[in-house]
Amino acid sequence: MKVSSHEMVPTHEIIPREEIPLLLEKYNIKLQQLPKLLDTDPLVLETEATPGDVLKITRMSPTAGESTYYRLVIATSL
């Protein structure tokens, strides 16, 4: 079963690498300041994202309408 097909799971998409600097500039942050997602996360695996990719997560909120979040994919270290 695809995790993303569940109605409660927000949309996840990989931001093109060339757009990451624009995102960081827009929010005046550094890459490492983004919240993290492990490369073993089911949605990271489903989107085929790799460490260093940034995922754009779009979800609907009853109070705010559409909300967008960004997460940096990091490698799992054992």
From Swiss-Prot:
List the catalytic activities from the record: RNA(n) + a ribonucleoside 5'-triphosphate = RNA(n+1) + diphosphate
Q: Name one GO cellular component term.
A: cytoplasm
Q: Which domain of life is it from?
A: Archaea
Example GO biological process: transcription by RNA polymerase II
* Single annotated GO MF: DNA binding
Give the EC number(s) under which this enzyme is classified.
Answer: 2.7.7.6
Where is this gene product found?
Answer: Cytoplasm
Quaternary structure? Part of the RNA polymerase complex.
According to its UniProt entry, the function of this protein is described as: DNA-dependent RNA polymerase (RNAP) catalyzes the transcription of DNA into RNA using the four ribonucleoside triphosphates as substrates.
Protein name, UniProt field: DNA-directed RNA polymerase subunit Rpo5
> What broad taxonomic lineage does this protein's source fall under?
Archaea, Methanobacteriati, Methanobacteriota, Methanomada group, Methanococci
Quote the gene name from the UniProt entry: rpo5
